[in-house]
Amino acid sequence: LSGDQALVYDCHLSPDRARLIRDTLAARGARRFNVILSHWHIDHVAGTEPFADCEIIANPRTLAHLTREKAALETGTYAGPPAISPLILPNRIFDDRLVLDLDGETVELLTFDIHSDDGTVLWLPKRGILLAGDTLEDCVTWVSEPEALPRHLPEIARLAGLGATAILPNHGAEDVIAKGGYGPGLISATSAYVTGLIAGTLSPDLATAIAEPVKAGDLRFFAAYQDVHSRNLAKVAEAKAAGLLT
């Protein structure tokens, strides 16, 4: 937020929560809103309706996924209720890199093939701040495209090349984010985890699998993610059995 302009990175889980975001920013003086979608997954696009009169920015893959699944998302049949109706599609499309100006501060939108093939991160180069969407997650990534994991590794390395000193993922420990975010160790921990998934070397026990980055302070252990880890291992095993991942 700067002056009367607000950049909104993702629009939350539901229209009512997105409306609260807009109302809160408006109460602080915002009159112009630009929404950036980090990727097409439901928990990031469900609140588009309150921003229907605004510029909604995404890359062409995000637009393609949302267009393909629009009917199912709006009827609540894609991944179950609630229905996202109406789903407002992006109306400004870019690829690779888009530079925005927020009252003199450079804001870069960059595309990455991590977690999903349509990732968009928000990078503030002057301050070293990276809004990572779901490209990074504490304490482990959610594998949605297991066959793409080998593509993700060089993309994670490219993400590290930005040199971010403060990383704000969409899913992470609230206290870490409130204190300014994660360090670059979150990226190396993600790379190590993806490498272990591909190689099949990770312990089925989450605490054991991520013991080193937790000890180093790069991750926070969260017991509920044991289910995510188990699901990731199963998804990778299924992809290997189907010949989609070697």
Describe each model-derived feature in a short phrase.
Residues Y9-C11, F33-H41, I57-P60, F112-D113, ...:
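Active-site neighborhood of phospho(di)ester-bond hydrolases with catalytic His/Asp-centered motifs
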Residues G161-L162, E174-T246:
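Accessory terminal helices/loops
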Residues S144-N170:
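An active-site-proximal "capping" alpha-helix that borders the catalytic cofactor pocket
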Residues I93-L124, I129:
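Core dinuclear metal-dependent hydrolase active-site scaffold
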Residues L1-D23, A27, V121-D134:
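Conserved beta-strand hairpin/beta-sheet module of binuclear metal-dependent hydrolase folds
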Residues A18-R19, D23-V99, A192:
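Active-site HxH/HxHxD metal-binding segment of metal-dependent hydrolases
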Residues L13, K70, W142-E147, A178-Y182:
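Short, solvent-exposed loop/turn segments at secondary-structure boundaries
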Residues S14-D16, W40-A46, L63-L66, S116-G119, ...:
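Active-site environment of divalent metal-dependent phosphoester hydrolases
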